[in-house]
Amino acid sequence: MTHAIKSERECQRGFRKNLCVNWDLIHLAETTSTNDICRDLPAWTAVRADSQTRGRGRFGRAFASQKGGLWLSASLPATGPAEVWAGFSLRVGASLLTHLKSIGLTAARLRWPNDILCGSRKLAGLIIEQPASGQLIVGFGMNVLNEPWTDSPELSDTATRLADWISPVPDLETLTTGILEALAEAHTQMLAGGMPAAIEELNAHWTEPLPVEISLSSGRTVRGSFLGLAPNGHLQLLDQTGSVFLVEHPTVERLRELEG
């Protein structure tokens, strides 16, 4: 177990923007799922694996996790009322996007709720689980040097990797440090401002109407132009008549971008 993040003394010198959290980092060569390992770990502990055999995304979807990518999960405290953490995945997505842009990935953008894309191809994604009261598990996966389409040819038209967008590519240790710092910042911001501040930041990324198709948990499918989030976190869509309607975010199983 190692400390992946700078010490508190370094924090005081300004390296951590006053977010003085010392993460304990466990590094594994291979595991089934870093999220599963994190379930039994205390807050501010993270697990990184070189590869996963049963990585997963939202709704239990399989997530390719080859060696050369960044596969990371972190255990965070969920203190206070449950409503404080409603929409935390959106807050995390905004913080991670800001961080990736800061290291030179200017092409990065966010697809609701928290997929990170470059162009039309998926670079990274995250999943947030709450296995126990008072605990949040954030799982983050990003293609870095790996080529996911070699194991999953169906990803050849939909996936990308960091090495195709920036050079030189930061090493996995440096990337891990930056991601954990972004998670700590998202946690602090959520406690301070909840969802309203996150929604404002997210809507600043979603400035142009985007044609989408949304699959709902009821089995229905709706189409419209995605306009961002309403103050309550629901999705705002513009229909063909020019009317704006809301889609409740808990009912959304998948959002697919359409050709404009």
Predicted regions and their residues:
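Short, acidic (Asp/Glu-rich) active-site segment that either coordinates a divalent metal cofactor
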Residues: G134-D164
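Conserved, helical-rich catalytic subdomain that frames metal- and/or nucleotide-binding sites
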Residues: D164-G219, E257-G260
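Acidic (Asp/Glu) carboxylate-rich active-site/surface patches
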Residues: T98-S133, F140-G141
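Conserved RNA-binding domains used in RNP assembly and mRNA/RNA metabolism
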Residues: E208-G260
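A generic structural motif
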Residues: D50-Q52, S75, L117, E129, ...
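Residue-level signal for inorganic ion chemistry
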Residues: T34, L72, L96, D115, ...
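Gly/Ser/Thr-rich beta-alpha loop segments that engage phosphate groups in nucleotides
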Residues: T53-A62, I127, G141-L145, A230
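N-terminal lobe of the biotin/lipoate ligase/transferase fold
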Residues: M1-L105, E208, E257-L258
